[in-house]
Amino acid sequence: MNAPAKPNDYSAYPDAEGRFGGFGGRYVAETLMPLVLDLGKAYADAKADPEFQAQLKSYNTHYAGRPSPLYFAERLTEHFGGAKIYFKRDELNHTGSHKINNALGQILLAMRMGKTRIIAETGAGQHGVATATVCARFGLPCVVYMGATDVERQKPNVFRMNLLGAEVRPVSSGTGTLKDAMNEAMRDWVTNVHDTYYLIGTAAGPHPYPVMVRDFQSVIGAEAREQILEMEGRLPDAVVACIGGGSNAIGLFHPFLGDEGVRLIGVEAAGHGVSTDKHAASLTGGRPGVLHGNRTYLLQDDDGQIIDAHSISAGLDYPGIGPEHSFLHDIGRAEYVSTTDTEALEAFKLCSTLEGIIPALEPAHALARVGEIAQELGKGKIVVMNLCGRGDKDIFTVAEALGRKI
């Protein structure tokens, strides 16, 4: 089967049905279809409304703290001895990750639609914290579904969500991780369609969620593009981001899609290795199927049953990926590689000791490949990596992995 040709105009995607080529779409229960269609119309209206956009920009600036800096990682650049490495510092946002960008956009949309109750799913807890934060800011009740496994390994974020007034509901079905939390959130949504808004955190789910999340996260790439032009006088040779569902990556990639000279590189979680059954690399080791309302690459067995994903990083522990990433993979516009748990831990330590920045385990996966990419590109070239979250939430996981007690 030949890969589809690259389009001349990426703005043509998704189509009216939310399809990126053969991916995306709206695969939802009959009871949800009217709500999903209403959401699509409401988002299209909001996107075209200058007042909504101005309101979002104001909150991004004065509440979230945007723009985030673009930082030259001088010591890491010297360490690897190749291209100049820049970090897009989205871990400096309010709440400590890129998740606030999307949470702000969607809460404003939910209020515009007259919704009075917010639900969300979370893996690492960062999206849960961001959702609880905006619900506290705007005075809306918040329920966050979180896998029981993730509740245990992300206790600081569970406490933060509770402190912000959210109710955290542990989900013990399956492996008790992000997929299972999303399943429970979808069930809640079906039951409470009239007053409840489901604030999805990743660039997946039924249309219009993948495009909404992409648009709200594209502030990352838009800022990075402007900042690197100001600092270096040209575009980077590569931009790199970690990928679970793919929201931070598509946010970085999208403003560079039309710049064919810029390589787009996504880094999946290889867990114990992609040759084992303990990984979360759905593009590397999966095939197309339908999950959580959209068609995309998924980890599945010969019978089409979803295989449980594994990663040391709770935010990458998902058996699928956003449909736009599946599309970019198939047309060859973006490249996707992977990083094991062990490699991510080494990168976590390296960034901490060389740059004085403790990254989240999610972007540590990207950093583990950035050194090789910088060496491959060579001196005089530029690579920009999205440092999408800070590592406070991961210190217990890292300490346990390193055999240390806190």
From Swiss-Prot:
Entry keywords, A to Z: Amino-acid biosynthesis, Aromatic amino acid biosynthesis, Lyase, Pyridoxal phosphate, Tryptophan biosynthesis
Enzyme class (EC, first level): lyase
Coiled-coil annotated spans: none
UniProt xrefs under CDD domains: Trp-synth_B
GO molecular function: tryptophan synthase activity
Cofactor: pyridoxal 5'-phosphate
Gene Ontology annotations for the cellular component aspect, listed alphabetically: cytoplasm
Pathway info: Amino-acid biosynthesis; L-tryptophan biosynthesis; L-tryptophan from chorismate: step 5/5
Subunit relationships: Tetramer of two alpha and two beta chains.
Functional note: The beta subunit is responsible for the synthesis of L-tryptophan from indole and L-serine.
PANTHER family on file: TRYPTOPHAN SYNTHASE, TRYPTOPHAN SYNTHASE-RELATED
Name this polypeptide is given: Tryptophan synthase beta chain
